[in-house]
């Protein structure tokens, strides 16, 4: 009967775990829906802003070509040889139970750091999310300039993105860094996500959509007091929206990974409960049969 007691205890413990994982799955699903809703609602603004920036950049570049000059600004992508000091912002989570989400980000960040070091670049790292910091601190503690809790735990607010942007812009305009990249998980669906390292500063003019030339058409932008001032005003706005979009993608990816992980855990718990219950019933049936056999044998002996 000791075996039956152990099985009852295991079944009860797994049922308790199943309830927890099921509840966590529902919470993650709710947060995922909120993040997706923000993504959908912010898309028109983001697209409109980026289209406007692209049109202005194309027009200014065209005007510079007509005047046989070069469009120069610290906000525009500098030559490769001048990109010496890199800031890597790693967006991970504070909590686990989300499958390979954090480990994939840690591996991508490690690979990028090693790539930059091999190229002779100076690297600084900002870790947002304790899991990301834990993945990097063993080998890169000397280059981690700040480690803080994740900014996407409960939900992303624009002021949080703006605060991070202000910090990065301060380093960039203060000539402390030449390039800023963000390592994060870009959301595709609840079951699919891509870990990427994306350059956010300086603005890479080569990545402008080729369709921007058509969008600009015959439009003529006259900048006052000059083109550079216009760039230095509008690019930071686009940068903040870019970071906000990255944070929302990061949150949606985390919650999608957690929902998927908890769904798998709930299914596994359910399967284990079924197997243990079957085993329990068989042992119980064997025990009852043995007792009946002993009773019948005793009665016949009398």
What do the predicted segments below correspond to?
Residues 1-302:
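C-terminal beta-strand-loop-alpha-helix "lid" module of Rossmann-like NAD(P)-dependent dehydrogenases
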């Amino acid at each position: 009967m000791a075996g039956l007691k152990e099985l009852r205890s295991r079944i009860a413990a797994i049922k308790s775990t199943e309830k927890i994982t099921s509840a966590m799955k529902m919470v993650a699903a709710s947060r995922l829906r909120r993040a997706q809703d923000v993504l959908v609602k912010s898309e028109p603004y983001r697209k409109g802003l980026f289209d406007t920036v692209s049109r202005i950049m194309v027009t200014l570049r065209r005007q510079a070509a007509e005047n046989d000059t070069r469009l120069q600004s610290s906000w525009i992508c500098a030559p490769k040889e001048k990109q010496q000091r890199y800031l890597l912002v790693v967006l991970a989570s504070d909590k686990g139970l989300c499958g390979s989400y954090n480990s994939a980000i840690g591996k991508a960040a490690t690979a990028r750091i090693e790539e930059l070091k091999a190229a002779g670049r100076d690297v600084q790292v900002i870790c947002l999310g304790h899991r990301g910091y834990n993945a990097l601190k063993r080998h890169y503690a000397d280059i981690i300039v700040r480690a803080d809790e994740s900014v996407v735990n409960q939900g992303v607010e624009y002021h949080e993105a703006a605060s991070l942007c202000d910090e990065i812009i301060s380093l960039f305009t203060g000539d402390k860094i030449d390039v800023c990249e963000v390592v994060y998980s870009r959301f595709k669906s609840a079951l699919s996500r891509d870990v990427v390292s994306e350059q956010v500063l300086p603005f890479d003019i080569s990545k402008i959509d080729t369709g921007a030339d058509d969008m600009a058409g015959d439009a003529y932008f006259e900048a006052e007091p000059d083109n550079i001032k216009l760039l230095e005003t509008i690019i930071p706005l686009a940068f903040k929206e870019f970071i906000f979009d990255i944070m929302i993608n990061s949150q949606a990816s985390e919650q999608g990974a957690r929902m998927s992980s908890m769904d798998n855990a709930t299914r596994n718990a359910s399967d284990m409960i079924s197997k243990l219950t079957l085993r329990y019933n068989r042992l119980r049936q064997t025990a009852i049969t043995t007792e009946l056999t002993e009773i019948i044998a005793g009665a016949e002996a009398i």
